[in-house]
């Protein structure tokens, strides 16, 4: 949502993808329209390659693609199910690749692809193995795509740190994690979205991951 609103404020019309959160999508649509921008809702299951290609085939042109959909299953290595492993890799890694592959042909005047990774890609989170692996691989994919699609299309990643407390993280664990951050607080939403603004405005940056984590990856 925040990335879509940022793009709308920068003057872009928006294609807003959602899977099952139709109420939230409609609310975001209204917020974007209040900024006098056009917005088109696109429902799709991004773990299904057929639905990805159907979604992209309806686009005439594209300037910026933000890959932010993610699945973060909790579970140690000995407890993680094959289903959760596959879903995490399909949504967090395969979908961004297929979207980049399909959308590149729509960026006829050049464009920007931004993959949303995670500070977890810099760490070894044993309680989120499939998520951590997928995000680390997505950063590698970002570099590969940047070389493959240059000079017409730039490809970068943003790796946020902690922003909002997840329902699966107990309050005491959240406080412990925040206490480890050198800047001693979670990120504000606008501190993450400003990285997207930077990548749009600076057209000499490609193949890079912008880490916005308050220094957490240092500890």
Give residue ranges: language-model regions.
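Substrate-binding pocket helix/loop in short-chain dehydrogenase/reductase
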Residues: 76-77, 81-89, 169, 177
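C-terminal substrate-recognition "lid" of short-chain dehydrogenase/reductases
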Residues: 106, 188-212, 217
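Short, small/polar-rich loop/turn modules that mediate ligand/substrate recognition or access, typified
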Residues: 150-154, 206-207
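Conserved NAD(P)H cofactor-binding loop of Rossmann-fold oxidoreductase domains
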Residues: 68-73, 214-215
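Alpha-helical segment proximal to the catalytic Tyr-Lys
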Residues: 105-106, 146-151
């Amino acid at each position: 949502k925040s990335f879509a609103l940022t793009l709308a404020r920068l003057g872009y019309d928006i294609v807003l993808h959602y899977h099952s959160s139709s109420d939230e999508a409609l609310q975001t649509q209204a917020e974007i329209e209040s900024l006098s921008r056009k917005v088109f809702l696109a429902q799709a299951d991004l773990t299904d390659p057929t639905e990805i290609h159907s979604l992209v085939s309806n686009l005439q042109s594209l300037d910026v693609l933000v890959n932010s959909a993610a699945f973060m299953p909790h579970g140690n290595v000995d407890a993680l199910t094959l289903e959760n492993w596959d879903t995490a890799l399909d949504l967090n890694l395969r979908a961004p690749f297929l979207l980049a592959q399909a959308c590149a042909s729509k960026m006829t005047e050049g464009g920007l692809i931004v993959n949303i990774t995670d500070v977890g890609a810099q760490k070894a989170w044993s309680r989120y193995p499939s998520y951590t692996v997928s995000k680390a691989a997505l950063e590698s994919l970002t570099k590969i795509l940047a070389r493959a699609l240059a000079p017409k299309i730039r490809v970068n990643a943003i790796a946020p740190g902690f922003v909002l407390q997840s329902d699966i993280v107990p309050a005491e664990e959240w406080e412990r994690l925040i206490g480890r951050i050198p800047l001693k607080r979670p990120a504000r939403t606008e501190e993450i979205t400003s990285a997207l603004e930077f990548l749009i405005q600076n057209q000499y940056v490609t193949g890079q991951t912008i880490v916005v984590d308050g220094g957490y990856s240092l500890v």
